[in-house]
């Protein structure tokens, strides 16, 4: 039994058709362009034995079997048609991504995984000359408005629950939830910031264990989350009016910035995306690049900040899914206007996550 490699991308390079295997990064050039017309028919009729495949392709393309067999043998010689047993595990892995609706993400991953970054060597701006740096900037933040202390979650999340949240999240499900509890807000923020909380305490108290701990500090220490709620949240001991809040990750509390219904404002700030404020709440993840680069003095710092931002967003998305919310995320924000709206001081708006 033979069949085509499972994840092929067709490109034109210097006017010559090239099929690229995204899994292995192998490329296959076609000097005989006529062979390309056989590939769709082969894909529809494999896996199959060579002779059976030739008959099916000949029938599909209205050519004789000898011609079809010659094309198939040419593709085998190129390495595009391979024994089915050699790619069974690859097919199973790809099919999982297809079933979950993650095809675009899979293609982007394979297309970008081997990109080279032109960073300076670690000896420049890294650990070797950390002693010549001045002390890191103070990272203590001023207290904002009235703070609402959140109760630490009473449950722990089992690995199976987290995996279920990861596998079941979708980007385009409609919002269906009508109410939001303070327990759900607390749980998402608490578990989403476990590592960020640890690093923030270290940075705020300047409790670095060594120069290395300063030089290679995680960007999680420089991330903060602003919470925008679109309806009043009531519970036994209090209530939280709709408005904008800054999450104090160290104290696990929400500091009031401004009260009001900001659905329309948030949609405009998300460049007109109504879905950005159609849920029950929005998290705006921000980063203090200046503070972070004062500790990690390397050009990788900006990239690290963006990567850790996306990781925090993934935590929020997964935790929201665990709590039966549907989600939406976007980096498409009017940066300066959002910064002013949030009164974010040194924090730069980077990513927006909405759930409902």
From Swiss-Prot:
Gene that this sequence comes from: tfxC
Coiled-coil stretches noted in the UniProt entry, renumbered to this chain: none
PANTHER family found in the cross-reference section: NITROREDUCTASE MJ1384-RELATED
InterPro entries: Bacteriocin_Proc_Enz, Nitroreductase-like
GO molecular function: oxidoreductase activity
Name listed for the protein in its UniProt record: Trifolitoxin operon protein TfxC
């Amino acid at each position: 039994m033979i069949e085509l490699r499972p994840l092929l991308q067709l490109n034109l390079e210097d006017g010559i058709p090239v099929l690229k295997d995204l899994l292995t990064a192998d490329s296959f050039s076609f000097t005989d362009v006529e062979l390309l017309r056989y590939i769709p028919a082969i894909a529809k009729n494999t896996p199959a034995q060579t002779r059976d495949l030739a008959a099916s392709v000949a029938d599909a393309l209205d050519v004789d079997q000898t011609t079809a067999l010659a094309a198939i043998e040419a593709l085998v010689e190129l390495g595009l048609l391979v024994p089915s047993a050699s790619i069974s595990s690859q097919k199973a892995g790809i099919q999982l991504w297809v079933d979950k609706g993650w095809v675009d993400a899979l293609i982007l991953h394979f297309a970008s995984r081997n990109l080279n970054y032109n960073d300076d060597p670690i000896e420049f701006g890294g650990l070797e000359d950390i002693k010549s740096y001045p002390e890191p900037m103070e990272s203590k933040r001023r207290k904002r408005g009235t703070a609402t202390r959140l109760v630490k979650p009473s449950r722990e999340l089992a690995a199976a629950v987290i995996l279920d949240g990861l596998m079941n999240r979708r980007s385009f499900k409609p919002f269906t939830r009508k109410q939001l509890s303070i327990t759900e807000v607390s749980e998402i923020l608490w578990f989403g910031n476990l590592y960020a909380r640890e690093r923030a305490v270290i940075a705020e108290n300047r409790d670095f264990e060594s120069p290395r701990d300063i030089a290679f500090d995680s960007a999680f220490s420089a991330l903060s989350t602003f919470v925008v709620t679109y309806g009043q949240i009531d519970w036994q001991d209090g209530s939280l009016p709709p408005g904008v809040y800054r999450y104090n990750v160290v104290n696990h509390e929400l500091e009031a910035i401004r009260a009001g219904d900001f659905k329309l404002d948030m949609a405009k700030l998300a460049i007109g995306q109504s879905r950005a404020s159609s849920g029950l709440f929005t998290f705006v993840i921000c980063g203090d690049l200046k503070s972070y680069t004062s500790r990690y003095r390397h050009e990788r710092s900006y990239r690290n900040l963006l990567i850790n931002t996306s990781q925090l967003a993934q935590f929020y998305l997964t935790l929201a899914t665990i709590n039966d919310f549907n989600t939406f995320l976007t980096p498409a924000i009017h940066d300066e206007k959002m910064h002013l709206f949030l009164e974010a001081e040194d924090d730069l708006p980077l990513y927006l996550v909405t759930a409902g």
